[in-house]
Amino acid sequence: MNAPSGLHRIVIVGGGAGGLELATRLGRTLGRTGRAHITLIEKARTHFWKPHLHEIAAGSIDVHEHATDYLAQSHWNGFRYRVGQMTGLDRAQRLVHVGPVLDEDGRPVTQGYARPYDTLVMAVGSRTNDFGTPGVAEHAIALETPDDAERFHRRLVNACLRAHMQATPLAPGQLNVAIIGAGATGVELAAELHKATRTLVSYNLERIDPERDIRIHLLEAGPRILPALPERIAASATGLLMKLGVKVRAGSRVTAVGAQGVQLAGGERVDAELVVWAAGVKAPAFLAGLDGLETNRINQ
């Protein structure tokens, strides 16, 4: 567990895009040359670039063809990968505490341990922020991980198979998708789903008419979609989405999510069988309890 004597110990917590890139660069420049000992701590076994999660959700790409194995990446690039999730920090002793890892049967893979450091980099990324909206945890899917995206895709396929096989007419909102939040993730998912649903139906699900039966609602609380981008880009994207048949609804704040759809602030209900929450992010909650670190209301 210890670095070679005398080497500067750099510990990076979090193997997202930033953490993995940093570990790789430091490993190549300092780790390989024996000038520092680089350790990346991450609970996942593989890395997937989050901006492509909407493509997994739509079924456009296979996650296993686009994932990077942490063990292999560390071996090739001069750093050490250690599986686990940070649970605490002792700043006085310069120790990162890491919890035990269990397999799918509940058996221990690794025990909890403390990793010493000289330089600590926190690159833990973000988590979904549902702003306390009722029903989000129970009835919506947030695309945080490849598992989330694959779960959404399975539900989408099952919904289409169910609709094709049922003898009764479609219920209100059946096959509809409500995407809450019109940032980059929401906009890209809406466009990708338009193509994906039509491809799926073309596989002999002829009882479903995608133009008639499938509605994609893109709901944004703010005055326009893509609020982080220039207005001209947002306007162009809005026009393109509307041409695809996506129902773009700015100024539509969601107050609750239920089993049959979402409730808007004005009292209107949007019926939907599938709901995706893409409305906001915050830093992981455990940061608020770390030794001596100050955080704001979203744990930054």
Task: List the model feature ranges, each with a label.
Residues N2-G88, A184-L229, V276:
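Beta1-alpha1 glycine-rich phosphate/pyrophosphate-binding loop at the start
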Residues G15, P100, V124-G125, G266, ...:
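Glycine-rich, N-terminal phosphate-binding loop of Rossmann-like dinucleotide-binding domains
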Residues L53-I61, A137-I141, I233, D291-L293:
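Short glycine-enriched, charge-decorated loop/helix-capping segments at active-site entrances
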Residues V83-L95, A250-G261:
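A conserved short coil-to-beta-strand element within the FAD-binding core of flavoproteins
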Residues G106-T119, A265-L274:
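Core beta-strand elements of the Rossmann-like FAD/NAD(P) dinucleotide-binding domain
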Residues V124-T185, H194-T199:
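Glycine-rich dinucleotide-binding loop and its adjacent helix/turn
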Residues E138-A167, G261-Q263, D271-L274, A278-Q300:
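FAD-site-proximal beta/loop scaffold in flavoenzymes
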Residues R212-G292:
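Internal nucleotide-binding/catalytic subdomain
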